[in-house]
């Protein structure tokens, strides 16, 4: 078995489907099946059993997957160590970043960091903050940038702090909200709770949900076309949107805030590249209150 086989087993275990594994590896299903049969022949085992939808790994298959994960981690650790021996900052930086931060902030940051350290390559995985948290816990990424609060055993530092706003095409008042169409969007549990709690406290009746869309950016476009109002964090608002915005306050009269957190393992600071990136982020002074 080599690195390609380790990756194959790891992804197959994640997907529990030969078809989806082939799609992720950009190869054909027959070639995946052929390689899996070769692995089974080498060890004289069955890796998995087929079921109506997908597959189920055997005990022997689970053992080989665990071995593949260990070998991939050892290989990555070796690559990191060798890169770290160089006097210059170089190597492969593995980042897990929440979708919103990745869309609105990350490109500019990576461009600036790449200008400072041109010999750095990036592996960036984006998604819900809960998914990024799983990547951190599994050691798949070295640095996580997450929205909202999460349990983390390592270092956790606030990177940004922003206000939440009501957004609409034209000026509106809080008293009008129960009678206006509300555009809801899918988001992580922490932001969803903040918004729902505020509405429960400040609106005399439940909002009229006109539609529910998949992303904040889609929601914002609907609002820009006058189809309703919504509540959004400052990170996604631009002057060019030409939207009416109203800050939200809690019962104590303080602005409702949305935090973005920088998370990493303390041991990762021993890697020049990771330390350089973390120091760079801290030097950006992105925290706003």
UniProtKB/Swiss-Prot annotation:
Q: Which residues bind DNA?
A: 18-37
Keyword Heme among UniProt keywords: no
Record-level Gene Ontology MF annotations: DNA-binding transcription factor activity; transcription cis-regulatory region binding
Matches recorded under CDD domains: PBP2_LTTR_substrate
One BP annotation, GO: regulation of DNA-templated transcription
Q: Give start and end of each HTH lysR-type domain.
A: 1-58
Q: Which Pfam families match?
A: HTH_1, LysR_substrate
Which keywords does this Swiss-Prot/TrEMBL entry list? DNA-binding, Transcription, Transcription regulation
UniProt name for this protein: Uncharacterized HTH-type transcriptional regulator YraN
**Which organism is this protein's natural source?**
Bacillus subtilis (strain 168)
